[in-house]
Amino acid sequence: MKALAALAGAVFTVAACYGLGSMLDARLGARLRRYEKFPLAFVLGAAVLHLAIFAVMALQIAYKPVLIAMLSGCVAAALVTGDWRLPAPEDTKRDGPLPTAVRYLFGIVFGISATAFTALYLFNAWAPEISPDGSAYHLGLVSRYLRVHGFERVTTNMLLSFSEGVEMLYVPAFAIGRHSAAALVHFAFLVALALAVLGYGKRIGKPLAGAAAALLVSLSPIVGIDGTTAYTDVATAAIMFSVFYWIQLWDETRDSRLLIAAGLLAGYCYAAKYTAFVMLVYAVGFVAWRTRKWQPVIVLVGCSLTMAVPWIAKDWIYLHNPVAPFANQWFPNPYFYVLIEKIWMARMRTYGLANLWTLPLEVTIRGEATQGLLGPVFLAAPLALLALWSREGRKLMVPFALVFITYFGNIGTRFLIPCLPFLSLAMLIALEGVAPALALLIAFHAVTSWPTVLMRYTHAWSLSGIPYKAALRMIPEEEYLGAHHEYQWARMVEKYVPPGKLVFTLTGLPDSYTTREALFIYWGALSNDIGDALTMGWNKAWQPARLSSFILPGGKYRRLRVVQIGTATIPEEQWNIHEMRLFHRGSELPRRPEWRLQASPNPWGVQRAFDNSEATRWRSWETLRPGMWITVDLRREEPVDRVQLELSGDEWDARMRVETTGANGSWVPLAAAAEERTVRYSTSLRRSATYEAHLRGVDYFLIKDDDFGAGDYAEFSDDWGLTRLEHAYGASLYKVNSDQVSPPGVNP
């Protein structure tokens, strides 16, 4: 039954998309040919359906009956209006008959390759979903939204702040058929992409090149693994290519109604993935160049905003940042730190590769560093330059260039998928007249992309076989998933952690398989702060190590500010202050509730420099630079003769001065004598760190055996105030002994 439910959920969702798109393209006057109607109508309908589901989620009425009724309405309307039907076949001279020998040769290669890989992909998509991002992130948010029947404000996971246009289609599929249904919907986008490439080749009079390019795209190992899981990259590629396709249809007829479809899809590009919005740039530029008029451009932009603005508004309302999780420097908020964003983006630009000149080999043959490969055949990508000699080739190379530019923001192989339709067609249209060469090229690509052959030359992320028994649930779903450690961790969390409780993890979980919320150390400010405190518990380099004191001129002060004047030597270095203390005649001024504390940057964390805990610290969460400051307003003048800062050992370039306000209210430096000494704590900070996590609502830790600090948690669990509930599948689940942790008060 689970297998049938998964198939039903996917088929129902795909049918609704196709029905909705069919009705829309009929009313736009689009004269689609038989071979191109399904891919173009399906993707266009997906854009519109995603917006309807967005509205359902916003209204908090995402119940299974509501979603089924929505899908049923789309299918029924298309059937009643007759728009569901495919156009009658037409005999076009441009697609004229091929020589018999060529037809047989190409038919054999095309038929065998398409059939074999369709079976491979179908059963992999149908099998239980356990892909890294699919089961954790994409379906994690879908299952979370369905539990609350709509959108939920999530400030603890930066991944959930991205636009979720493709995931909206996973919502009804998941509600009906769970995880595999969503993966099958993505597989439908893979099919649509291949058919669209094939259709475009036929439309421009290059049927062989179109067929070969469709296989070049769809047989690529990275397309296979991505398009059969609940990722979104293949769907994004299909949406982007559809924008190009509709723009070319408009260029043939100059029917302005077709720009509505192109505009909706360009906006849907943004809803699918931020960088895909570059297709609006392409569409606007092409239409403006061809018409020299502003009215068509307004139609394009207006329709695109219909799709994009809801996602911009959602992020603005929930996170105070319309393009979260990016641009936090320009849209400051307490949820995502600037430095984490920059470190993450820097890593995405390199993936640990010392030399980016190795990228061509990495993404085509190796694939381990960039998490997937296109296939060796794409080493022939320079063939695309031959397309510049033809008008049709230049039409393809312009969007390819625009999309390819965005790739360098994240050089993972799957981020090249949107380039493949344009690149593949451009590579092969010059070979239209050399059918045997096309057949050999596709045969080579098919052989080198088949799983058993792939394993001989790479260990990159790719499909490993045809899991038909798992797909048909001849192997029980629980048994199939149980072979994956990540799934077992999720079940461990579900078993021990009470509903509503948070779990902190250094590893991440397949969130779609648990109803508990996991805080991954990297994805949000709350997790960053908890991880920082816990790391201090076992890593002495992060603990307080220096006392910087400033002897002030005698007098009374109301406002004091410590200003950073040093410059970091590495981007990761921050300004960290564990405690800022004020003294008079050797006695610390007692902290009062009326004190006003401020800091720049990170004003939200300033209290950590005044909480009397060495297991916390105010951090700039930006690279240490001159001009940063932390201020205390005593609300009245008080005698102060010393400012003392407790600094950690991982800030090497911090240099500071103390300022106060002058008679005119402006800040003026004080002639303060600086003293510095090192300190060492004899008392462990482990339990203090645990208390900080407990204080923020975290009473459970999932620690993998090879996580940093894992040995310390296991060996000194009593010192941490933890009880290990279970150790299995290479990970331990700990519970905080809340009766054993208390507010820290360790002072040097």
Which residues does each PLM region occupy?
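Membrane-embedded, hydrophobic transmembrane alpha-helices
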Residues: 1-94, 545-548
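Transmembrane-helix signature of polytopic, membrane-embedded enzymes
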Residues: 31-41, 180-181, 197-219, 238, ...
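Signature aromatic-anchored transmembrane alpha helix within multi-pass, membrane-resident enzymes
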Residues: 107-114, 260-264, 280-284, 298-305, ...
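Hydrophobic, aromatic-rich transmembrane alpha-helices
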Residues: 115, 358-401, 438-443
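Membrane-proximal, lumen/periplasm-facing interface regions of secretory-pathway glyco-
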Residues: 129-140, 444-492, 509-511, 657, ...
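Membrane-interface transmembrane helices that cradle and orient dolichyl/undecaprenyl
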Residues: 199-203, 243-259, 385-391, 431
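Short periplasmic/luminal acceptor-recognition loop of GT-C membrane glycosyltransferases, typified by
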Residues: 479-526, 694, 698-707, 734
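Disordered, acidic Ser/Thr/Pro-rich linker "stalks" and the adjacent N-terminal cap
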Residues: 544-555, 568-638, 648-653, 660, ...
